[in-house]
Structures are given as C-alpha cells and as structure tokens.
A protein has these predicted regions:
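Short acidic/polar hinge/loop motifs at secondary-structure boundaries
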Residues: 8-34
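N-terminal periplasmic accessory domains that precede
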Residues: 18-21, 33-36, 41-64, 75
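Transmembrane beta-strands of outer-membrane beta-barrel pores
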Residues: 35, 54, 70-72, 81-83, ...
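Hydrophobic, lipid-facing positions within transmembrane beta-strands of outer-membrane proteins
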Residues: 46-48, 62-64, 71-75, 117-121, ...
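Outer-membrane beta-barrel strand-turn architecture
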Residues: 56-58, 81-83, 125-129, 165-171, ...
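Transmembrane beta-barrel wall of Gram-negative outer-membrane proteins
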Residues: 69-94, 107-143, 152-173, 179, ...
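Outer-membrane beta-barrel signature, preferentially recognizing the C-terminal barrel domain
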Residues: 152-154, 158, 162-166, 207, ...
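Signature of Gram-negative outer-membrane beta-barrel scaffolds
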Residues: 221, 226-332, 348
C-alpha cells in the first residue's frame, strides 16, 4: 500500500502491532483512499492508496485540548502566529504502560514494555494572495519487550515543506520537498550475547503538481517527482562482553523518478472520464558488489562464481515503464458511483516481512539485478 502524510511517504502506519494508527485523529483534516485503480499522480505501489493530510491550526485564537485514556493520553495545541495570516498546530500522544508493570514482583511482568509515542506539527503561512507555505512534521516510536525477550524499537520520522502557488485563475501548483525515515532496532541486553541490530530506509524527495482548469467540466493534471532512496537493510553490532561477530549487510542506493499527465472530462451530468499516462524510471546505484552464481543451482555462498564491483553512484540497473490508466465513472447517487477502469502499475521497492514476530521488523529491498 502507498501511505502518505502531507505528500510524504510513510513506511509504517501503525502502533501496537496494528491496534492503533500512527495518525492522530485530532490533527487530521481529511483522508483520501483509493482501492484498485488510482490517479496517475500516485504510484510506486501496486495495491491501494491512503493519503492523510494534517489540518491547519486555528489562525484566530489559541486553543488547548487533550484527554487521558487507558491506552493513550493526548494533547493538542493550536493558535495563530500572526492573526489571520499564519498558524501552528502541535499534538502529541503517549502510553504509560511501563508505570503499571515496573512495580510487579514477577520479573516477566516487570520487564514487559509496550509503549509508543508520536508527535505531529504543522505550520502554515499566507505569504500573499497567491502563495501559501506549509511545514509539516511527524515523529513516532514504538518500544516493545515481552518479559525476558529482546527489546524492539521502531518508528517513522517525516518532514515536508510545500509551496502552494496560484499562477492565474485557471492554473494552480504545489511544490513539495520531503524527508522520510523509517528505522528498526532490536536489542539483546544479556551480557554474554548482547548485541544491537538495526535496519533503516531514508528517502529524500522533490515533487511538483499542477492543476489546469480549462473549464468547470475539463481539468488537466500534470507533474513530476524525483526520490533518492538510501537503504541499510541490516547491521548487528555485538556488545562489549559478547562473543558474537559484527554483521553488516551494507547499503543500497537508488533514484526513482516519474512524470505524469491526466485529462479529466465530464461527459454529462453523471458520466466522467479520466485518462492519463505515467512515466516512471528507477535506477539502482553503487557502491555495491553483485554476485554471479552457477546457473541452475541454489544461490548460496558456495555457488558464487564471480563478483562485479560498482563504484559510488555508478548505475547497476535501470528500469523504465509507461503506465496508461483510464477510468469511466457513472454517478448513481450523491453517495455512490459505478466505476470501470484499466490500470498499469509497477512497484520498485519491496517489503520483506518477518512472519515470526508481530513487531514491525520489515526490511525493504530495491529492485536490481
């Protein structure tokens, strides 16, 4: 699934193994969901799309709200920076289960941890009549330890900046830059076998989106984006007293870009047709070592026959795809519609899930040779 927060990619969308969303409902303005076919401005995943947007803070007066719960406590502040021109919204949530379990006499219970915390922030500025600037941020982390088991920590950090510009009465644009980071850590605290295992993926992206309203029944949408992916799939660092060896799977670097154009036209009061093309490109870059194996046998260390070494930023493999999409919608009622569509989708980043533990210990892998 493609999950986004204020135009930025989110790699992990839940707390408590899926029981709670990472998105604080107090800070959410709207949610856009597509199942199956979706517009050409979305891509990179082949399932569904969910785009969440922060709401703007109150630009007229300060307000404070919050609540205490058995699972989660929350707090939200919002108010004007400059009245009627700029505002802020800051919210946070946290659990306090550690305070309930640390006093237990049973070491299995006292060592139990199942906590999470997250913070949301949005600042918006009306620069002038034609320009608005938005800054959005999210930081969240889960921490889990079952008795004498390993301590696991994981979380997202996201920051985005967006400029909304009105060119004229018919043309609008959004320019966005964002940073998205997802990390996972597992910690063994036993002295003889202590270690810290880490996994991380970081994205740096620039994107632009344009909307041209030819008339109320005819809209053109077009834009482009480029994303730099840095993946560190796994590293294990032994403790001082540990007899284990350090293991490092290295890192991967990739550049993903796309451009799109779509045409939405209202054929009648109830029938709308949307057609478009999306052009995508993905390049896996060095530094990296690519192993060649004996054909027809299982890929093991003993089956390696040669190694190709690539220098930093050297191209290892490039993919290019064109994705046509067509949707015909018939509006049955105000709340229901019938859709027929054709979509071509592609996914270059792949998630390797761990089915043994319920924690979010997913590892991401880039397409390559």
């Amino acid at each position: 699934n493609l999950i986004m927060l204020d135009e930025a990619l989110i790699y992990n969308s839940h707390h408590f193994f899926g029981l709670t969303s990472v998105f604080n409902p107090d800070a959410v303005s709207d949610v856009e969901i597509y199942k199956g076919s979706y517009p050409v401005n979305y891509g990179g995943r082949i399932s569904s799309v969910m785009h969440i947007r922060h709401r703007d803070g109150n630009n007229e007066r300060f307000s404070l709200s919050g609540g205490l719960g058995l699972i989660t406590s929350r707090l939200l502040l919002e108010g004007p920076i400059q009245k009627n021109k700029s505002s802020y919204l800051i919210s946070g949530r946290s659990t306090f289960w550690d305070f309930l379990t640390r006093g237990a006499k049973n070491p299995t219970i006292s060592g139990y941890r199942a906590n999470y915390r997250d913070f949301n922030a949005k600042f918006n500025f009306d620069i002038n009549q034609n320009n608005k600037l938005f800054f959005s941020g999210y930081a969240g982390q889960d921490e889990n330890k079952l008795g004498l088991d390993l301590l696991r920590k994981w979380g997202n950090d996201v920051f985005s900046m967006r400029l909304n510009h009105i060119h004229n009465a018919k043309l609008f644009s959004n320019f966005t830059a964002y940073l998205s980071n997802y990390s996972y850590r597992v910690i063994e605290e036993d002295d003889k076998a202590s270690f810290v295992g880490t996994s991380r993926i970081t994205d740096y992206a620039l994107k632009s989106d344009f909307n041209y309203f030819r008339n109320p029944e005819h809209i053109y949408n077009f834009g482009a984006s480029v994303t730099f992916h840095r993946l560190a799939p796994g590293k294990r660092i032994p403790g001082v007293s540990s007899t284990n060896n350090e293991v490092d799977l290295g890192s991967e670097h990739a550049v993903e870009s796309y451009a799109y154009f779509s045409n939405e036209i209202k054929l009648s009061s109830k029938v709308t047709m949307t057609s478009g093309l999306r052009f995508s490109q993905f390049s896996l870059l060095g530094p990296s070592d690519v192993y060649l194996y004996t054909p027809g046998v299982t890929k093991t260390i003993n089956a390696i026959v040669d190694t190709i070494s690539y220098a930093p930023r050297e191209n290892i493999k490039t993919f290019f795809n064109v994705h046509p999409r067509v949707t015909l919608k018939y509006q049955l009622t105000e709340t229901s519609a019938l859709k027929v569509n054709y979509s071509s989708l592609v996914q270059y980043m792949h998630r390797l899930s761990n089915t043994i533990t319920p924690s979010s210990s997913d590892i991401w892998k880039a397409s390559g040779k």
